[in-house]
Amino acid sequence: NDHTLKDTDDFITRLKNFDIKANHFMASLDVESLFTNIPLDETIDICLQKLFDDKCVSKISNLTKSQFRTLLELAVKECYFLCNGKIYKQLDGVAMGNPLGPVLANIFLSHHESRWLDQCSIRFRPKFYVRYVDDTFVLFSHKSHLSKFSEFMNRQHPNMKFTYEAENDKKLNFLDVLVEKSGNKISTSIYRKPTFSGLYSKFSSFGPMQYKTGLIRTRCIEY
């Protein structure tokens, strides 16, 4: 949907194209343990609804709805792990490290958040709302709206629990960006966590080449 961010560059572009007011208050929302709290059956239903109701599948595959459901269930529900010599099966949620994790998280939240925002009272609805997987950046017309909006969001789905961080001294970090507000002006710079050491694996180390070249591209874009 329109609220989903592709990357940091997309976030900066959207933010700088937004008409910032001097009274706007910045905050970020985070979904607690999103991947392990994704309801798989509900999310699979959402996937099938979007694929088959919009007839997307017929353009690329001859699979039936039942066959597609079976494939999705095999990909995300047959997850086992070994702990203290015992084998366990994960009953719900996306397993950590599953490549489908970010995809299913985006599908689930994208399906719900537009409706949640429409149902939210206009009195404390955010003026600006964008999300990257489980991290959301919002702008309110008053700082008191943040707690009200957080309470509203925490009532929407039993699996989704949101925490928030408010701006401090007109500054807020989101993803790897430090956002600073001065009047109706916004400036951005690179944000580094206090634990950042600046150390990276050697280029000659044994690892996928796409990860190494991806890191170089990312650093070039940042600077």
Residue ranges and their predicted role:
Residues 1-223:
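Charged structural interfaces that engage phosphate-rich ligands
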